[in-house]
């Protein structure tokens, strides 16, 4: 797993993903495609960027591991945006999610943040074989860098 920061994003990468690199808070993470290690290192990677996690936005609920980590380890208020109602119901029924986690059923591409966040983690899967992939990634980085100090998007390194 590795990452590029705003000042280190090359023009080639920026143009590929249609990213405005004028701000230093754009971050792209990439991995070897090992989903376990991606999840394992997302929290550690975010520590490298900032020490303040009071308000966190996470796109994608998954099994709730990443939101749970921020809420319990960093005492963060976590907003999770998830578009799958069945997944939300299943995870909420387990009853283990921290009280600081607020799940909103919405699409991260159309969701309008109501507040600023210390970090926005896009823990969602993109279809990297689809040409829309690059547009989707760039649009999320550009959109959430306005309301967040850091934007982190895991990308597969193929």
Language-model regions, residue ranges each:
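The AdoMet/dcAdoMet-binding core of the Class I SAM-like
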Residues: 2-12, 24, 41-158
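Charge-rich, low-hydrophobicity low-complexity segments
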Residues: 11-19
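Long alpha-helical, hydrophobic tracts
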Residues: 17, 32-42, 91
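Short polybasic amphipathic segments
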Residues: 20-32
């Amino acid at each position: 797993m590795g990452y590029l920061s705003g000042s280190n994003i090359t023009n080639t990468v920026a143009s590929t993903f249609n990213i405005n690199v004028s701000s230093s808070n754009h971050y792209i993470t990439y991995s070897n495609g090992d989903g376990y290690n991606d999840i394992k290192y997302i929290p550690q990677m975010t520590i490298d960027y900032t020490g303040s996690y009071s308000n966190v936005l996470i796109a994608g609920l998954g099994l709730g591991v990443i939101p749970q980590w921020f809420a319990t380890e960093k005492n963060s208020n976590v907003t999770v945006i998830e578009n799958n109602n069945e997944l939300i119901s299943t995870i909420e029924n387990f009853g283990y999610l921290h009280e600081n986690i607020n799940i909103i059923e919405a699409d991260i591409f159309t969701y309008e943040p109501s507040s600023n966040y210390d970090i926005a983690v896009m823990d969602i899967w993109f279809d990297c074989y689809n040409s829309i992939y690059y547009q989707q990634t760039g649009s999320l980085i550009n959109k959430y860098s306005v309301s967040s100090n850091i934007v982190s998007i895991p990308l597969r390194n193929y």
